Protein backbone atom coordinates (compact mmCIF):
# COMPACT_ATOMS: atom_id res chain seq x y z
CA UNK A 1 0.00 0.00 0.00
CA UNK A 2 1.26 3.46 -0.91
CA UNK A 3 1.59 5.97 1.86
CA UNK A 4 0.60 9.55 1.31
CA UNK A 5 2.32 12.52 2.82
CA UNK A 6 -0.89 14.47 3.27
CA UNK A 7 -3.61 13.47 5.63
CA UNK A 8 -6.49 14.17 3.26
CA UNK A 9 -7.05 12.20 0.09
CA UNK A 10 -6.37 13.89 -3.22
CA UNK A 11 -9.46 15.44 -4.81
CA UNK A 12 -10.97 13.41 -7.58
CA UNK A 13 -14.17 13.46 -9.54
CA UNK A 14 -17.12 11.92 -7.70
CA UNK A 15 -17.83 8.40 -8.76
CA UNK A 16 -21.43 7.50 -9.54
CA UNK A 17 -22.63 4.02 -9.59
CA UNK A 18 -24.95 3.05 -12.38
CA UNK A 19 -28.51 2.34 -11.32
CA UNK A 20 -29.17 -1.33 -11.04
CA UNK A 21 -31.53 -2.73 -13.59
CA UNK A 22 -34.84 -3.83 -12.28
CA UNK A 23 -35.30 -7.54 -11.89
CA UNK A 24 -38.46 -7.41 -13.97
CA UNK A 25 -36.69 -6.73 -17.26
CA UNK A 26 -34.76 -9.64 -18.65
CA UNK A 27 -33.39 -7.71 -21.64
CA UNK A 28 -31.70 -4.95 -19.68
CA UNK A 29 -28.58 -3.38 -21.10
CA UNK A 30 -25.35 -4.12 -19.36
CA UNK A 31 -24.11 -1.36 -17.08
CA UNK A 32 -22.00 1.24 -18.91
CA UNK A 33 -18.27 0.85 -18.66
CA UNK A 34 -16.34 3.75 -17.25
CA UNK A 35 -14.47 5.42 -20.06
CA UNK A 36 -10.76 5.39 -19.57
CA UNK A 37 -9.31 8.80 -20.23
CA UNK A 38 -6.70 8.05 -22.85
CA UNK A 39 -4.33 10.88 -23.58
CA UNK A 40 -4.83 12.34 -27.03
CA UNK A 41 -2.03 11.62 -29.45
CA UNK A 42 -0.20 14.74 -30.50
CA UNK A 43 2.39 14.21 -33.21
CA UNK A 44 5.65 16.03 -32.60
CA UNK A 45 5.82 19.44 -34.19
CA UNK A 46 7.67 19.52 -37.48
CA UNK A 47 10.94 21.36 -37.15
CA UNK A 48 10.95 24.74 -38.82
CA UNK A 49 13.18 24.90 -41.87
CA UNK A 50 16.46 26.60 -41.22
CA UNK A 51 16.92 29.62 -43.44
CA UNK A 52 19.93 31.81 -43.72
CA UNK A 53 21.24 32.79 -40.31
CA UNK A 54 20.03 36.15 -39.15
CA UNK A 55 22.83 38.63 -39.53
CA UNK A 56 23.02 42.15 -38.25
CA UNK A 57 20.51 44.41 -40.00
CA UNK A 58 22.14 46.52 -42.65
CA UNK A 59 22.50 50.11 -41.65
CA UNK A 60 21.24 52.82 -43.90
CA UNK A 61 23.01 56.04 -44.66
CA UNK A 62 24.55 57.94 -41.79
CA UNK A 63 22.91 60.81 -40.00
CA UNK A 64 24.78 63.47 -41.96
CA UNK A 65 23.81 61.88 -45.28
CA UNK A 66 20.18 61.77 -44.22
CA UNK A 67 20.30 65.41 -43.14
CA UNK A 68 21.95 66.41 -46.42
CA UNK A 69 19.35 64.50 -48.43
CA UNK A 70 16.55 66.12 -46.43
CA UNK A 71 18.04 69.59 -46.88
CA UNK A 72 18.40 68.95 -50.61
CA UNK A 73 14.79 67.84 -50.79
CA UNK A 74 13.66 70.95 -48.95
CA UNK A 75 15.64 73.19 -51.31
CA UNK A 76 14.25 71.41 -54.36
CA UNK A 77 10.72 71.55 -52.98
CA UNK A 78 11.09 75.25 -52.31
CA UNK A 79 12.38 75.91 -55.82
CA UNK A 80 9.62 73.87 -57.43
CA UNK A 81 7.00 75.47 -55.20
CA UNK A 82 8.15 78.95 -56.15
CA UNK A 83 8.19 78.03 -59.84
CA UNK A 84 4.66 76.58 -59.70
CA UNK A 85 3.43 79.54 -57.67
CA UNK A 86 4.96 81.88 -60.22
CA UNK A 87 3.11 80.10 -63.02
CA UNK A 88 -0.24 80.52 -61.26
CA UNK A 89 0.24 84.14 -60.29
CA UNK A 90 1.73 85.20 -63.61
CA UNK A 91 5.06 86.18 -62.13
CA UNK A 92 4.14 89.79 -61.34
CA UNK A 93 7.01 92.20 -61.98
CA UNK A 94 10.64 91.44 -62.76
CA UNK A 95 11.54 92.24 -59.13
CA UNK A 96 9.18 89.50 -57.91
CA UNK A 97 10.72 86.98 -60.30
CA UNK A 98 14.27 87.63 -59.09
CA UNK A 99 13.43 87.11 -55.40
CA UNK A 100 12.47 83.40 -55.64
CA UNK A 101 15.54 82.65 -57.75
CA UNK A 102 17.79 84.18 -55.09
CA UNK A 103 15.93 82.36 -52.31
CA UNK A 104 16.19 78.97 -54.04
CA UNK A 105 19.99 79.08 -54.24
CA UNK A 106 21.83 78.04 -51.06
CA UNK A 107 23.73 80.79 -49.23
CA UNK A 108 27.18 79.37 -50.06
CA UNK A 109 26.38 78.43 -53.66
CA UNK A 110 28.74 79.88 -56.22
CA UNK A 111 27.22 82.16 -58.83
CA UNK A 112 26.85 81.09 -62.45
CA UNK A 113 29.58 83.55 -63.49
CA UNK A 114 32.26 81.12 -62.17
CA UNK A 115 31.23 78.44 -64.68
CA UNK A 116 31.80 78.33 -68.42
CA UNK A 117 28.41 76.77 -69.31
CA UNK A 118 25.00 78.21 -68.35
CA UNK A 119 23.77 75.05 -66.51
CA UNK A 120 27.11 73.79 -65.22
CA UNK A 121 26.24 74.54 -61.59
CA UNK A 122 23.04 72.46 -61.78
CA UNK A 123 24.90 69.66 -63.57
CA UNK A 124 27.60 69.57 -60.88
CA UNK A 125 24.95 69.43 -58.15
CA UNK A 126 23.41 66.39 -59.82
CA UNK A 127 26.78 64.68 -60.35
CA UNK A 128 27.87 65.34 -56.75
CA UNK A 129 24.59 63.94 -55.46
CA UNK A 130 24.88 60.84 -57.66
CA UNK A 131 28.44 60.20 -56.44
CA UNK A 132 27.59 60.66 -52.75
CA UNK A 133 24.26 58.80 -52.57
CA UNK A 134 23.88 55.05 -52.72
CA UNK A 135 20.37 55.47 -54.18
CA UNK A 136 20.49 57.61 -57.33
CA UNK A 137 16.71 58.10 -57.22
CA UNK A 138 17.32 60.55 -54.36
CA UNK A 139 19.01 62.82 -56.94
CA UNK A 140 16.03 63.03 -59.30
CA UNK A 141 15.28 66.55 -58.10
CA UNK A 142 18.72 67.78 -59.14
CA UNK A 143 18.30 66.07 -62.51
CA UNK A 144 14.91 67.76 -63.00
CA UNK A 145 16.38 71.17 -62.17
CA UNK A 146 19.21 70.54 -64.65
CA UNK A 147 16.69 69.60 -67.35
CA UNK A 148 14.69 72.78 -66.64
CA UNK A 149 17.86 74.84 -66.93
CA UNK A 150 18.76 73.20 -70.25
CA UNK A 151 15.27 73.90 -71.57
CA UNK A 152 15.55 77.54 -70.49
CA UNK A 153 18.89 78.06 -72.27
CA UNK A 154 18.24 75.87 -75.32
Swiss-Prot record:
A single GO BP: mitochondrion organization
Pfam families: CHCH
Region of interest: Disordered: 1-64, 86-109
GO CC list: cytoplasm; mitochondrion; nucleus; striated muscle dense body
Disulfide bonds: 119-149, 129-139
InterPro entries reported for this sequence: CHCH, CHCHD2/10-like
Ranges of Low complexity composition bias in the record: 7-28, 48-57, 96-109
Top-level division of the source organism's lineage: Eukaryota
Motif Cx9C motif 1 mapped to chain: 119-129
Protein name as catalogued: Hemiasterlin resistant protein 1
Chain's gene name: har-1
Amino acid sequence: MVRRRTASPSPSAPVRSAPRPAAQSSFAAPPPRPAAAAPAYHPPAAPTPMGAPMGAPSQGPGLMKQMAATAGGVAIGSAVGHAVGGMFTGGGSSHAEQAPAAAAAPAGAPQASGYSQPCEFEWRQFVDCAQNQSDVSLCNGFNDIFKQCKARYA
